[in-house]
């Protein structure tokens, strides 16, 4: 899925998940089409989500694993 197509996707049936280690503050994530990911605030899901292509998500995940964000 291309970046410009992500926000046109209907994700009302997405299966959102969050860390089992979280308390009250948490980010939820859902895999959408083609390995793309959507993230939202679990306390305020009505404000919307951020969407990332599979390539963007992979680069972010690799950066976290490599310690690039502190």
Q: What positions do the PLM features span?
A:
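Positively charged, low-complexity terminal tracts
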Residues: 1-70
């Amino acid at each position: 899925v291309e970046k410009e197509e992500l926000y046109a996707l209907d994700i009302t049936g997405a299966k959102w998940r969050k860390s089992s280690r979280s308390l009250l503050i948490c980010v939820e994530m859902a895999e959408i089409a083609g390995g793309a990911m959507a993230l939202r605030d679990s306390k305020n899901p009505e404000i919307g989500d951020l969407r990332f292509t599979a390539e963007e998500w992979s680069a972010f995940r690799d950066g976290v694993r490599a310690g690039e964000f502190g």
